UniProtKB/Swiss-Prot annotation:
Residue stretches making up the TGS domain: 288-363
InterPro entries: Beta-grasp_dom_sf (IPR012675), DRG (IPR045001), G_OBG (IPR031167), GTP-bd (IPR006073), GTP-binding_2 (IPR031662), P-loop_NTPase (IPR027417), Small_GTP-bd (IPR005225), TGS (IPR004095)
UniProt key word Nucleotide-binding: yes
GO MF term (any one): GTPase activity
Entry keyword Iron: no
Organism encoding this protein: Dictyostelium discoideum (Social amoeba)
Name of this chain's protein: Developmentally-regulated GTP-binding protein 2 homolog
Limits of the OBG-type G domain: 63-288
Residues annotated as binding GTP: 69-76, 115-119, 246-249
Gene Ontology terms: cellular component: cytoplasm
Gene Ontology process terms (BP): cytoplasmic translation
Top-level taxon: Eukaryota
Family affiliation: Belongs to the TRAFAC class OBG-HflX-like GTPase superfamily. OBG GTPase family.
One Pfam assignment: TGS
Amino acid sequence: MGILEKIKDIEAEMSRTQKNKATEYHLGLLKAKLARLRQQLLDPPKSSGKGGDGFEVLKSGDARVALIGFPSVGKSTILTKLTETKSLAAAYEFTTLTCIPGVIQHKGARIQLLDTPGIIEGASQGRGRGRQVIAVARTADLILMMLDANKGEIQKRLLQEELESIGIRLNSQPPNIYFKLKSAGGVNLTATQTLTKITEKLAKSILHEYKIFNCDLVIRCDPTVDELIDAIEGRRSYIRCLYVYNKMDHMSMEDVDRLSRQPNSVVISCNMNLNLDFLLDKIWDYLNLVRVYTKLRGASPDFNDAIILREGATMEDICRFLHKELVSQFKYGIVWGVSAKHCPQRVGISHALEDEDVIQIVKK
């Protein structure tokens, strides 16, 4: 029996099994088997074949955003609207057959936007170009899930299932679980709080399903079975996602209002250029980028040349960005902006910067 058949059998058994206290142990083991089989399906073959067809795109710019969606939902159109790249768009499906990059210029940042081929149901199991598309999604800092507003909820559920099944977790954080394999000593399981969703017996059985008999497992949260499996697998991507409902010009105002109030959602119309500026601002917010401006002593800062960093960046990050030897030469920094308690403020190398701060670096 092949892997796909085993996956289908387990999924069928899970759908037949009523979920209650008596069956949660059995369902937990089934979930572990299912996750292990799906990972086997995704692992690349060891044999080397001919080179690829150029589907992968070199990462560039300050951040990467991937467009994911079913065929003919407006991915190519929005790439053309937000960037200077022309991606073939048509009213029929599967217009885009490879990955097409573009660059969004917004607030001084260069954001790489990737238009991927339309996903079809079963993509995670290899249908269409699903595996390549999902591999690109793993490398993104943000996923824009493009949805047809008239079919949005159905498409959203199917795409979430496809991404979840191959280890992409949308708008969530990794569970606070420490896991480390050992060569001997058995399973050392420690929970720092009461476990209400799994038992110690179930946790050890899931480990045994993965042929793990020696490890340290420290659980600092109250995880579900799925979260425990994620920690054991270790190959999970936690990526922020914006649900972009296109074709709002074909909807009633009541439906537009309802969709726009949903978490992590934006309603737009590519054809009529509605709400595209708001979408750009949302992309900026979700990428957690900050702009930092530098100045020389006695000179004014150049507000047309920002250094783009991640939220939480420090003076040390700025030094490394400017020159690798600047960290060792750093004496102190002077900061004007939101992060300063008073302007200007003399700061150390660990000082955290905020958006639109102005800095001056003084060397030893």
